[in-house]
């Protein structure tokens, strides 16, 4: 095969031509769709005589005209990826292109395709080129009109971006709709939907008094499940006005629900398209986690209206400019509507579970990558979640009001433009009249920094010193690293468990006084931006225990000299609840790693009684938030522990985590039982923090108890399963029962399927639960489920649930006999023929094959080599597989 072409950030050039306006006409048909595109073109630079090169994939060109005249065949060239007009006229001109496409055959789900009988689009990042020939790049912004013609019976609803300005009937049972979007946008934000849909309608009055019509479109049978999404949308609109002063700018906002969708959701201007699971919810069919995800993602896509649509990215390398910022915004939104600490813990856990391994593997890239083969592969946890942490650091440095000033200046300067990460950095620094030395390294250096800290107390001078050093590990293409700018939020805790007032700090030859409007300061942010640096706190009357990196103020690994007793002390006393949780996590990680070493040396495993007591006191502490308690008694995941080992050992980590879980369940059994009993409720389901926290704590305790596999605890879980009145509690009980192989597990799984087989979203949960299971030899069960009548390889959600879920069970995916690897290798090649984007997400599970022992390495490598040598492999899969092999 021809090796795919790599694209580099440093090679960016402005477009030779600009598009001022784009008029699209779609004649939607069952066999083919005709697309007519009329574009007003102007030169990007005065007097340019360059050829005009347009992107295009899988298109049949029917005609091309310039200024109303057909072009002769010698005046343009077409190949499999481009249409080039050799000698465009000087100055402005009109370009008209007619193409024929086949949406019903488009299984890639990018461009225009059909999903359950409806037409639908997905254009980000480079899907618009599958609709018509175009400069398909984000720095080409134009105003759009879109006229859609279709059969009125089959497609009664016709939607596109902006405002509906005309509609009517046509001959032959057809009808049309004409949409106009007055705001300039890049092609990736174009959207079209046509089909049989019903809508939930509501309205929102903006802060300036504009009444906006809100509609959520879905097949009629699902309409009742859109109430929570509508609540989430209105809450997001209000929050963005209150927190960022950002008001919606059109009279209509549509959301459309689609069962077959590659992404979670898409922020197309005024016509958001969502995968079903991120909109549809009822207490009986969706869990608290689903409700929270819907709130966050509906918020996220709405927030893009300003951070992404009004101000967009100059090129795709800048993706974190819109995504890191908008993830940060949706995290803040969910925090304000729920419990901030619990949300922070969830976000940091996600970062450590998924992003840290990516940053330490062959696909490591900065939040702004330097190159890519296929942009779809860079919609990653690094660009999104680490990107959000980088945005959060601006807020940590400048405070909420300074961050708001930076945002205001960013919009004032760049509304209607396609810009870069440097533009955002400049707006933040200029608005606060401050420079952040070497902060831009976060955009260009890959890898997770490790910060080491040692402390010392001098009683005679009453000073406390913190010495920091930092190291960023080598990553592919970046062997040598520069020091990063790392904001470290610090508090000092006295022997009674209270925060000490901080008066002044000496560092780098400067004495800095700490006051805040005459009020004492208990947490300060240290600006650590050298290889090594010391900070000395003055007027510290006794030796404190430092609380470091409060609120997780930077996305780093922290290696401190805190003793075990310091950590137990912080677990009991730290006023920063995130660090209270973190102290427990550090203790858990240390315990698990030492037990893994014991297991590998075939020593008897024993649990530290202090650890059990520490968790018991958290469990009994009625002053703590219940969801916080649930998080605090949950052990770190297997992946997080494997990540800390020189050679990852999935069997040892699984055995140790299972041992600790059962031992805790045994020793805390009475406390766990009373917690389950005390947190039952017969009230109707409500989505609010207190109710969710109660369910989270109850379900966490139930999972511990069921792990014992004793008749009384199994019966308890079965009773909870049978008596549950909502999906959160029913599914948690099912998951608790599913930990142990046997008849009860099989019967309950079958009962659940029989009850919910007609709800495809619940069936996806059922697939995921079985796929992620750690029961021995699970690969055979998953193989069998591939042939289940409810499974469909063409539906991304089902693939993510079953195949993605299986890759999430380290002990089965990394089975010693290579059966997990073989299963994935075969599935990836099947999937690649249907949907390359989804296939490349699956093949990513192989990327860290070198972390394992030699026999596993050989087995995984064989699958990667088999994949790379396959005929007709997509660029998407080739990029991930070849980079994984090269590592």
UniProtKB/Swiss-Prot annotation:
Site location (Transition state stabilizer): 384
Gene Ontology MF annotations: alanyl aminopeptidase activity; metallopeptidase activity; zinc ion binding
Keywords: Aminopeptidase, Hydrolase, Metal-binding, Metalloprotease, Protease, Zinc
EC number of the protein: 3.4.11.14
Lineage: superkingdom: Eukaryota
Family matches, as PROSITE patterns: ZINC_PROTEASE (PS00142)
Gene3D superfamilies, per the entry: 2.60.40.1840, 3.30.2010.30, Neutral Protease Domain 2, Peptidase M1, alanyl aminopeptidase, C-terminal domain, tricorn interacting facor f3 domain
Protein name: Puromycin-sensitive aminopeptidase
Organism field: Oryza sativa subsp. japonica (Rice)
